[in-house]
Amino acid sequence: MELENDTRIPEFLLLGFSEEPKLQPFLFGLFLSMYLVTILGNLLLILAVSSDSHLHTPMYFFLANLSFVDICFTCTTIPKMLVNIQTQRKVITYESCIIQMYFFELFAGIDNFLLTVMAYDRYMAICYPLHYMVIMNPQLCSLLLLVSWIMSALHSLLQTLMVLRLSFCTHFQIPHFFCELNQMIQLACSDTFLNNMMLYFAAILLGVAPLVGVLYSYFKIVSSIRGISSAHSKYKAFSTCASHLSVVSLFYCTSLGVYLSSAAPQSTHTSSVASVMYTVVTPMLNPFIYSLRNKDIKGALNVFFRGKP
């Protein structure tokens, strides 16, 4: 029993992006700026939706929740990385690493489910406009949100418990800027067959399945839009989906890039850089993508800050 306990290490080293001292101030300033923009942008979007009663609709309900999750998602990794860069201390305890991994998987999963639910919401709004508010009632919206949280929490808990059974013998260095699940599994010196099988199963169930749902929803949406005779109505229908489609494409393309880069040999640096895209860049861009051409969001913020439409 004592031998087994000795294989449990007290801490890991997060190697980050670069050990070059001259690059540390640049990296700190870059990620601090992106972090602050992410928090501010998503908070403003939540503020706009909550302050304007006209935006209390299913679409904006899910959008506000997506912004909240994006804030939490970013807060699981960036603050620790900023502290490590500033203090030049890359140590993270075993317990902190497990906690960070759990919440990262939790919020990444909720992000994924919410994007799928939002695609379903747009499908209902465009394909069944007369019954939209009846179908997408507050009870169903709350239920879809609750199911997203529960499924993601269960998945995150299961993956975390699977990591807790692993032993780490000699390799204490994580070639990443946070405790990423796949990196943790690769560092283990015990048998990881079950962990890898669970990882692939989760990728199919929680990655491919929601993506198929999104693609199916947009296939039906495009088919429905093509049947609209009015050019103005076509443009309006398409514009309501363009923002969400941009966010979905950004999220899934960058996630796929991380998955492919982590599967390739000798690609830890590439995987870290690719991870920045969906852990930092995507949450930062989401509020701007949704509000750039959205007159309702800009109008709500204008009323809130200036007191007039």
Curated annotation (Swiss-Prot):
Any one GO BP annotation for this protein: signal transduction
Protein localization: Cell membrane
Entry-listed glycosylation sites: 5
MF GO annotations: G protein-coupled receptor activity; olfactory receptor activity
Pfam families linked: 7tm_4
Residue stretches spanning the membrane: 26-49, 58-79, 101-120, 140-158, 197-219, 237-260, 273-292
PROSITE patterns: G_PROTEIN_RECEP_F1_1, G_PROTEIN_RECEP_F1_2
Domain of life: Eukaryota
Protein name listed in UniProt: Olfactory receptor-like protein OLF4
High-level lineage: Eukaryota, Metazoa, Chordata, Craniata, Vertebrata
